[in-house]
Each structure stands twice: as C-alpha cells, then as structure tokens.
Amino acid sequence: MITTKKTLLSEIEKTIKELNFESITEERKLILQPLVAFIQSKVENHQEIRLNLICTHNSRRSHLSQVWAQTAAAFYGIKNVFCYSGGTEATAMFPMIAKTLLKQGFQIKTIAKGTNPIYAIKYAENEYPIIGFSKTFDDSFNPKSEFAAILTCSSADQGCPYIAGAEKRIPITFEDPKVFDNTTQQVEKYEERSIQIATEMCFVFSQIALYYGIK
C-alpha cells in the first residue's frame, strides 16, 4: 500500500512544508486519531482507502477537506487513497474556495459552468485532478460502500445519524468560514481555515508515513 512520495506542484509543496503540526492541540489529535486508525487498518490489510468528506451543503469545508486529504496522501506517499465529498444537500462549491486553493498553489480549471460549476483541481503535474462540484453524500459520483464518512460540520453530523455503506463514521468538524462572507476578513479567514484543514490532514497521513518509515 505504500509508495514513494508524489512530486506536488511547487507552491503546494511550499505550503505544506510551512505547516506547523505543533498548532494542533492534544484534544484535537484525539479527534483525528480514529481517522488515523481507519487509514492504518486499510494499509495493513492492503485495501483501498476511501474517504467521503461531508458537510451540509458541500460548498466549503468538505471541499477543502477532500482536496487536502487527497493531496496529503500523495505528499506522504500513501497510495490507493480516493477522496470524495458530499453534503446533505447539493448547492455549489463556493467561489472563494477555488480562489483560496489557487492562492495556495493548486491549478484550477472550470470545466463546466452554471449554477453548480465543475472544477478540475490539480495538485501534481502527473496525477489525475480532483473533480470538485457540489453533490449529496450518496450521489452516484461517490462510493456506495467500503468508505469512511468524515463529518466536517456539526449540522451534518447531527443531521446524518446513518450513512448507508459507510464502514466508519468519524466526526472531524471545522468552523465555517461562511460567517466571514461579505466582510473585510473573508480572504484571511478562508485561508486560515484552509491551512487548518491542510495541517490536520497532513498530520493524519504523516502518522501513517512515520509508522512505515517514509521520509
């Protein structure tokens, strides 16, 4: 299940290398531990690792979490990782998410416009791009079984007591940057939330890499 690290786009590499794991509290590490354990069990059993990152509208936090989890897996050399996202309802990926990721080094191309645009999000020159658009967590685009459901907001956690097909349900909630929309702090707070999610997803995959001695 382990492979060599992927070469990411240079600005993303720079962003990741500047992350500070010491900013993660011990309490927060306990929240992340079930995800570490899920990934570890899949690696040990030579199984594919499927993560479905879920929030209410699949518009902000779930997209950031999907993108950074997939990127972290590549950076730390954990193969056969497939990350998805969804919501309890479909809306659209909020434009500030694309702008934030673009600023942090991702290449983003709009491949379909409309009320629910579809984006191709590249983190490495030779890897398939992440396809970003809003959908429900049980959309046909997402896996039907053998996945972990990662709840990235408390309302989705409370509103989805049962997620069909999920092997494991793991709440890892983040504060919504939406509260800063239409304020002078919007750009700063979206970047801040993205960096928090990047830090925590990279920490999770770094634990797997550490166990297997990947440098």
Task: Provide a role label for each language-model segment.
Residues 2-215:
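Short polar/charged helix/loop
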